[in-house]
Curated annotation (Swiss-Prot):
EC code: 3.1.11.6
GO molecular function, one term: exodeoxyribonuclease VII activity
Subunit structure: Heterooligomer composed of large and small subunits.
SUPFAM superfamilies in the cross-refs: XseB-like
Entry-linked NCBIfam families: PRK00977.1-1 (NF002137), PRK00977.1-4 (NF002140), xseB (TIGR01280)
Originating species: Haemophilus influenzae (strain 86-028NP)
Reactions mediated catalytically: Exonucleolytic cleavage in either 5'- to 3'- or 3'- to 5'-direction to yield nucleoside 5'-phosphates
Protein name: Exodeoxyribonuclease 7 small subunit
InterPro entries recorded: Exonuc_VII_S, Exonuc_VII_ssu_sf
Pfam family, one: Exonuc_VII_S
C-alpha cells in the first residue's frame, strides 16, 4: 500500500495520498508493520506538502512585492467597455 512520494507531484495529489493514508490508519485494520509503513509514508507526504505550501507562499510574497513596487496610474473611466 505504501507509495513513494514523487517530489514532482502537485500539492493536490500529495494531499489526496495523505488523506488516503489517514483513512487507512483510522480504520485500525492494518497489521502493525503495514501501519508503520503507511505512517512513515504519511510523514514523508506531509513534509512534501509543507514544502509545496512554503514555495507557494514565497511566490505569493514575491508577486505582492512586485505589485507594491509598481507605480500607480490614474484611473480613467473610459478604459472599460461600456464606459464612454
Amino acid at each position: 500500500m505504501a507509495r513513494k512520494p514523487a517530489s514532482s507531484q502537485d500539492f493536490e495529489t500529495t494531499l489526496a495520498q495523505l488523506e488516503n493514508i489517514v483513512t487507512h490508519l483510522e480504520n485500525g485494520d492494518l497489521p502493525l508493520e503495514e501501519a508503520l509503513k503507511e505512517f512513515e509514508q504519511g510523514v514523508q507526504l506531509a513534509k512534501l506538502g509543507q514544502e509545496r505550501l512554503q514555495q507557494a507562499e514565497q511566490r505569493i510574497q514575491i508577486l505582492l512585492q512586485k505589485t507594491e513596487d509598481a507605480p500607480l496610474n490614474d484611473y480613467k473611466g473610459n478604459d472599460y467597455e461600456g464606459n464612454a
